[in-house]
From Swiss-Prot:
Protein name: NADH-ubiquinone oxidoreductase chain 4L
Tree of life domain: Eukaryota
Gene name for this UniProt entry: MT-ND4L
One Gene Ontology MF term: NADH dehydrogenase (ubiquinone) activity
Catalytic activity field: a ubiquinone + NADH + 5 H(+)(in) = a ubiquinol + NAD(+) + 4 H(+)(out)
Membrane-protein topology: Multi-pass membrane protein
Membrane-crossing segments per the record: 1-21, 29-49, 58-78
Role summary: Core subunit of the mitochondrial membrane respiratory chain NADH dehydrogenase (Complex I) which catalyzes electron transfer from NADH through the respiratory chain, using ubiquinone as an electron acceptor. Part of the enzyme membrane arm which is embedded in the lipid bilayer and involved in proton translocation.
Record bears the keyword Membrane: yes
Lineage, broadest ranks: Eukaryota, Metazoa, Chordata, Craniata, Vertebrata
GO cellular component: mitochondrial inner membrane; respiratory chain complex I
Oligomer and partners: Core subunit of respiratory chain NADH dehydrogenase (Complex I) which is composed of 45 different subunits.
Length: 98
């Protein structure tokens, strides 16, 4: 296995561990999610380039679109929680229910 794949997998695992350990604040969780999505994007791009299959190039672009949507929804939730409670704790998400 080339070293670049090991580095990308290590980046994904570090982001996953950050998501597991620092899950009390929404901002740190969003940053860890973005790190995971970035490493998945790079890994899928490298695999699509190695496959030499033209339709495989759609997968990284679709993943990038979903990552942008996830970031937009996460930032909207962060703004909503910050305006309502003044804090960015994840346990405040349960208080937004009607």
């Amino acid at each position: 296995m080339p070293i670049i794949y090991m580095n990308i997998m290590l980046a994904f695992l570090i982001s996953l561990l950050g998501m597991l350990f620092y899950r009390s604040h929404l901002m740190s969780s969003l940053l860890c999610l973005e790190g995971m999505m970035l490493s998945l994007f790079i890994m899928s791009t490298l695999m699509a380039l190695n496959m030499h299959f033209p339709l495989a190039n759609i997968v990284p672009i679709a993943l990038l679109v979903f990552a942008a949507c996830e970031a937009a929804v996460g930032l909207a939730l962060l703004v909503s929680i910050s305006n309502t409670y003044g804090l960015d704790y994840i346990h405040n998400l349960n208080l937004l229910q009607c």
